[in-house]
């Protein structure tokens, strides 16, 4: 899957990357868990700003980065997409990477009034 395909159904994207790349590993917000060919989601946390870890994840093989800061404010040499809210797009990005598995499920509900 290409980065542009991963982002296609995601709302809240402020700036799309100018380049595309092949994504061969999952999305992660944990810099230590990013796999070569994967996507790093950089967001500002309570104690650590994930944007500061972008050079490290790129050195470890990240193919692309999604972050909350404007592209001009981050040190990123791979395709970068800016989003409004990193936490809000984490689930949809993971679902997109895995081909939206919940769309293939049939949900059946059973309800009752006693008990």
Give the location of each predicted region.
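N-terminal leader/targeting and accessory segments in enzymes
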Residues: 1-92, 96
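Walker A (P-loop) phosphate-binding motif
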Residues: 95-115
């Amino acid at each position: 899957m290409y980065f542009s395909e991963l982002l296609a159904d995601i709302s809240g994207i402020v700036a799309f990357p100018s380049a595309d790349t092949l994504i061969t590993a999952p999305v992660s917000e944990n810099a230590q868990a990013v796999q070569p060919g994967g996507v790093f989601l950089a967001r500002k946390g309570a104690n650590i700003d994930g944007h500061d870890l972008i050079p490290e994840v790129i050195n470890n093989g990240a193919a692309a980065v999604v972050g909350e800061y404007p592209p001009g404010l981050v040190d990123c040499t791979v395709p970068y997409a800016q989003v409004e809210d990193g936490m809000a797009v984490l689930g949809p990005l993971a679902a997109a990477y895995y081909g939206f598995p919940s769309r293939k499920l049939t949900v059946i509900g059973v309800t009752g009034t006693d008990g």
